[in-house]
Amino acid sequence: MKFIDELDLELVNQTLNFETSESKISGGCDIFTTKPVASDKKLYKTIDRHLESLLQENESYNAAIQQQIELENKRRDPKQAGSDCAEPAEDSPTRNANSFWEQKRRMSVSESPRADTSPLFKSQKLNDQQLKELVSHPLEVPGCKSPSNETSARGVLRRSTSAGSFENNAGSAEQQKRRTSSIGSAANGTKSPILRRSSFNRETINIGPFGPISETASRRTFAYLIGILNASYPDHDFASLKPTDFVKSSRKQLVSKFENSIIALGKQPQEWIWETINAHMDLADCVFYQYNPQESFLDDEPGHLWSLMWFMFNKKRKRVAYFYLSAFRVKNPPSTGGSVALDEYYDSNSKPELREKRRRLTIEHETNDFEGEYDLTYTSSGDGAVEDEDEDMNDAD
C-alpha cells in the first residue's frame, strides 16, 4: 500500500494536533492506495494463514455443538418413541369400533347377496368373525401395530358397502401413514423431533464486519486495515488481530462521534475538514469501519487517555483513509505556583524511592545526622576552628 501525501490533508493533520489545559490531542487523516507492494503480499499470506486457523477453530466449535445435539437427540428419542407407542389414540379405538359396528349394521339390513357376488360376501360368519377380531384388537399406533391387525383392517375396508365409511377409514389410514413415516424417520436418525441440527457452511461464515471470511474480497479488506495500522505504528505488529476487533460504522455515526469529541475538548467543528476528506475519498461511496478492540495497544503508551480510529474504504477509487483522534496526558510540569507547586508535582509524579531519597536530604527530615547547633567557624586554610573569645577570657582569669 502506498501513502498519498497531499498538502490539504497536511493542513487537516495540523488542525487536529493541539493541546488543552489537561491533555495533548493527536489526530489526522492518512490516505493509502490499495495497490499491494512486496511487503503487502507477504502480509496477505500471513493474514490468510491466521484466518484459516480462525475458521478451523470455528468449525471445531460447530462440530462440538453438532455432537452435543446428536447426543441430546439419542437420549430423548427412545423416551419420545416409547411415549408415542404407549399413548393411546384418543379417538382411534372408539372411532374404529363404532365404524366397524356401523358397517355390520348396514350389512345386516342390506339386500341378500346375489349369486354372482364374490365368496367374500356370501359368508356372513366370516364377516362377523373378522369384525369381532378387529373390535377386540383395534388398530394400534404406527410403529407398534402388528401385521395381522393391518391385514384385518384392509379386509374390513374391502368389505365396506358404505362410501362414507370408506372415506373415513381412508383418511385414518393416511393419517397413520404420515405418523409412521415421521416416527420411522426419527428412528433412522434422519430428522430429530426434539432438536434441530444447526447447519453451517464454510462459505457463509461471517467473522467480524467484513462478510464471509472465506471470500478473497473480505480477506483483502481486512488485510488493508492491518497494513495501515502496521504502517502507522511501526513499533507494533497487528497481524494477530481478529476481524471481531473491528465494527462496521456509518458516515453519520463517524461525524457525530468525532464532532462531539472535538466540542468536549473546547474546539468547534470545522466543515472544511470534511470537504477536504470528501474530495479525496468520495465519502458517499465509502464503507466505514471502526477499530474497537477490548484492549487498545495504545494503553501501554505513557499518558494515554482515549483514542478513536476509523477507516474509510472506497472500493471504486481503491483507497483507504485512516482517520484518528487520540488524547494523552500533558507531561510538562505546571509553570506557575512557585516551588510549592513544583514540589507537589514531583511528589505526585516521581517514584516513591526518589521521593524518599529527596526528603532525606532536607534539614527537617527526622533521619538526618546533623542534629543540634552547627559549627560555622571552620576556615578554608585548614588551621582548624577559631576559638571562642569567651574561652580565651576564662583562661586569662
Swiss-Prot record:
Start-end of Polar residues biased regions: 120-129, 159-174, 181-191
Which keywords fit this entry according to its UniProt record? Nucleus, Repressor, Transcription, Transcription regulation
Q: Which family does it belong to?
A: Belongs to the MAF1 family.
Q: Which domain of life is it from?
A: Eukaryota
A single cellular component GO annotation: cytoplasm
One biological process term from GO is:
negative regulation of transcription by RNA polymerase III
Cited InterPro entries: Maf1 (IPR015257), Maf1_sf (IPR038564)
Stated name of the protein: Repressor of RNA polymerase III transcription MAF1
Q: What is its main location?
A: nucleus
The answer to whether keyword Transcription applies is yes
Q: Tell me, what does this protein do in biology?
A: Mediator of diverse signals that repress RNA polymerase III transcription. Inhibits the de novo assembly of TFIIIB onto DNA.
- Keyword check for Nucleus, yes or no: yes
Q: Where is the composition biased (Acidic residues)?
A: 385-397
Q: Where is this protein found?
A: Nucleus
GO MF term list: RNA polymerase III core binding
Instruction: Extract the coiled-coil ranges from the record.
Output: none
